Amino acid sequence: MVSANGSHCPYDDSFKYTLYGCMFSMVFVLGLISNCVAIYIFICALKVRNETTTYMINLAMSDLLFVFTLPFRIFYFATRNWPFGDLLCKISVMLFYTNMYGSILFLTCISVDRFLAIVYPFKSKTLRTKRNAKIVCIAVWFTVMGGSAPAVFFQSTHSQGNNTSEACFENFPAATWKTYLSRIVIFIEIVGFFIPLILNVTCSSMVLRTLNKPVTLSRSKMNKTKVLKMIFVHLVIFCFCFVPYNINLILYSLVRTQTFVNCSVGAAVRTMYPITLCIAVSNCCFDPIVYYFTSDTIQNSIKMKSWSVRRSDSRFSEVQGTENFIQHNLQTLKNKIFDNESAI
């Protein structure tokens, strides 16, 4: 049990080391495989790339950059020692926030793009261009990197355990929370969470309303079902991954600044923080599902790959069957010749 900085409330968060180690290991394996496959399809399989694909490529790159830092985090949470230096600690922290809020903003870009394509298909043609999509992506990268810079500035390694080990990713001091971090959290939550959340819900609602209008009722039922699945998957992943962490981050900020002085509330919030963070990190594994339901080309590429694999397997089976048939006939012929020679 340790006491919160400047607080009389004891808490024990040692469980987070095991939780982080297990969760980050799983995210590393699944996230690395799924996002590498996604990048391969985007670069090698897609012959025509549109503005939506541009957002998805940047989202996959954001996921991969964060996934590459996970082995260092896994090592730290397993050994509780950071031997990789202060710079890599700062880079790992920056890529965590860059990935989380970059994912939120890129998913929002995909949602807004879908909204423009369905609700204003003709008026939005001048807006929905690959050039504009690239400009938006550059703006997103600058925004998330600028927003994560203060956290990187305050995060650094420090000695622990009688100077026998180095710590990284540990809690900031209470004084830092009161003076700087609480204001940074307000900015991050408004720009990086609440505005994107409102945009996602609003755009999805207007798309659903447009699809139910008499003018669009003539659309094929299959197309409508596909759009509904797309919206459902998008919102579920967005809300599941990011809502718990960001709501808890607000409460966590209030606890660390001692706005909440209730020990029970503080303990609950501190306990939920590592859990919600693990849920948020899992977005690296779920983002490829968004790619699948958003892009017909990706669906077709995966189906073609699986079809070609099945076809090659069937060809192999046919060849193997033919070889077995030939071998059987040769053996039969050999036996007949041997019987005839024996009779002579």
Swiss-Prot record:
Residues 1-25, 78-90, 156-183, 252-272 are extracellular. InterPro entries: GPCR_Rhodpsn, GPCR_Rhodpsn_7TM. It is a multi-pass membrane protein. Residues 47-56, 112-134, 205-230, 294-344 are cytoplasmic. It is found in: Membrane. GO terms for molecular function: lysophosphatidic acid receptor activity. It comes from the Eukaryota. One of its GO terms (cellular component) is plasma membrane. Its main location: membrane. Pfam families: 7tm_1. Belongs to the G-protein coupled receptor 1 family. Binds to oleoyl-L-alpha-lysophosphatidic acid (LPA). Intracellular cAMP is involved in the receptor activation. Important for the maintenance of hair growth and texture. This is Lysophosphatidic acid receptor 6. It comes from Rattus norvegicus. The lineage of its organism: Eukaryota, Metazoa, Chordata, Craniata, Vertebrata.
